[in-house]
Swiss-Prot record:
Pathway(s) where this gene product acts: Amino-acid degradation; L-histidine degradation into L-glutamate; N-formimidoyl-L-glutamate from L-histidine: step 3/3
EC number(s) per entry: 3.5.2.7
Residues where 4-imidazolone-5-propanoate binds: 82, 145, 178, 246, 323
UniProt-listed Pfam families: Amidohydro_1
The protein, known as: Imidazolonepropionase
Gene from which the chain derives: hutI
Length: 405
């Protein structure tokens, strides 16, 4: 298929994931038409307009078409790994103990600062390829392992280059307020000053960040410190996101909502008030079962409270070297169902429509609607539930990015 190709996918079943459609918006005996990288028709094949009769046809053999999957929370660009910390945790050390002993995020900072931009791209591509192989068409990538201006810029530039190396959409997030670098000697206020006055202006000037994130936790930054970063992001007209309530309830979810954040992520310790605040603000709850599983957390995010409040829920891998070295969004869906008791529809919507909402790109992708990008995943399955049910099996038949297979 060429960039300006016109293609009809015939003999398909289509899960449109439209907002108010029941049963994932499933259409049997359907066709989907792509023209100039956009969806121009998605509906019953017997109602296909005659104007598309001359288009190239691809017979889907009754396979299921969904929106291309979206991994809306990753730390994909990093250097090295932290397998040694994994061994420590198996021996009983907690995430906090590893971090306070100089491990955790700070060890990844040392590795990233020593790596070149080319090194980072080279090391990250295999992780990205693993996601792409499962039908992923959009990936969010955070910085946050540089923690100084040049290293954060290096990370974000490496992330943007991923989208040049592969047919995938990359959304970049500046996560300067991720951890306190060792050279700050515990002075968090001075470091936040650097984030606000040194890093963020340079990153904003170069247009390297689609969003600004922070880690609101006792071992990272407190709500008043995060608020300073968010105020600065607002001044630069950059939307915000937040790692919130992962290890304790500092009311990070409510803080994120108060800034109209695109999303608040993790949320194991979020309370009902936080869920309600997020629903009112339209802030998406991005749940990260890979991290929950990997650090053997026991506190589950309040899925029932999110449902009751009407908070939208997304799922993501949280790929990172310390707490979620996970590169499978299919497994993430299974974890969302088995660990968090999310429904099949919630899981599939969570890696398509709601993931797009969490990135502020629902107007472009995430559902199969006329005018949206032709980002598709075509699956060799009989029931949508198989995407969530199977473990260690990839039923992807074809992946389509901007209309191209």
């Amino acid at each position: 298929m060429t960039k300006n190709s016109s293609t009809v996918f015939t003999h398909a079943r289509i899960a449109t994931l439209e907002e108010k459609a029941a049963n994932l918006g499933l259409i049997e005996e359907a066709a989907l038409v792509v023209k100039d990288a956009r969806i121009v028709y998605a509906g019953p094949e017997n109602k296909l307009p005659g104007e598309y009769a001359s288009f190239e046809k691809i017979d889907c053999g009754n396979r299921l078409i969904t929106p291309g999957l979206i991994d809306c929370h990753t730390h994909l660009v990093h250097a090295g790994n932290r397998a040694h910390e994994f061994e420590l945790r198996l021996q009983g050390a907690t995430y906090e103990e590893v971090a306070r002993a100089g491990g955790g995020i700070v060890s990844s900072v040392r590795n990233l600062r020593a790596a070149s931009e080319d090194d980072l791209v080279r090391e990250t591509l295999p992780r990205l390829d693993a996601l792409i192989a499962e039908g992923v068409t959009t990936v969010e990538v955070k910085s946050g392992y540089g923690l100084d201006r040049d290293s954060e810029i290096k990370s974000l530039k490496a992330a943007r280059r991923l989208g040049e190396e592969r047919d995938v959409a990359i959304r970049t997030t500046f996560l300067g307020a991720h951890a306190l670098p060792p050279e700050m000697n515990g002075d968090k206020a001075a470091y936040i000053d650097r984030v606000i006055n040194d890093m963020l202006p340079a990153i904003a000037e170069q247009g390297l960040a689609d969003a600004v994130d922070g880690f609101c936790e006792g071992i990272a930054f407190l709500p008043d410190e995060i608020a300073r970063v968010f105020d600065a992001a607002k001044a630069h007209d950059i939307p915000v996101k937040l790692h919130a309530d992962q290890l304790s309830n500092l009311h990070g979810a409510a803080l994120a909502a108060s800034y109209g954040a695109l999303s608040a992520d993790h949320l194991e310790y979020t309370d009902a008030d936080g869920a309600a605040a997020m629903a009112s603000a339209g802030t998406v709850a991005v749940l990260l079962p890979g991290a929950y599983y990997f650090i053997r957390e026991t506190q589950k995010p309040p899925v029932e409270a999110f449902r009751a409040a009407g908070t939208k829920m997304a799922l993501a891998t949280d790929n990172n070297p310390g707490t979620s070295p996970l590169t499978s969004l299919l497994l993430t869906m299974n974890m969302g169902a088995t660990l968090f008791r999310m429904t099949v529809e919630e899981c599939i919507a969570g890696v398509t429509r709601e993931a797009a909402r969490a990135l502020g790109i629902l107007d472009q992708t995430g559902t199969l609607e006329i005018g949206k990008d032709a980002d598709l995943a075509i699956w060799d399955i009989e029931r949508p539930a198989e995407l969530v049910y199977r473990i260690g099996f990839n039923p992807l038949w074809k992946r389509v990015f901007k209309g191209q297979i």
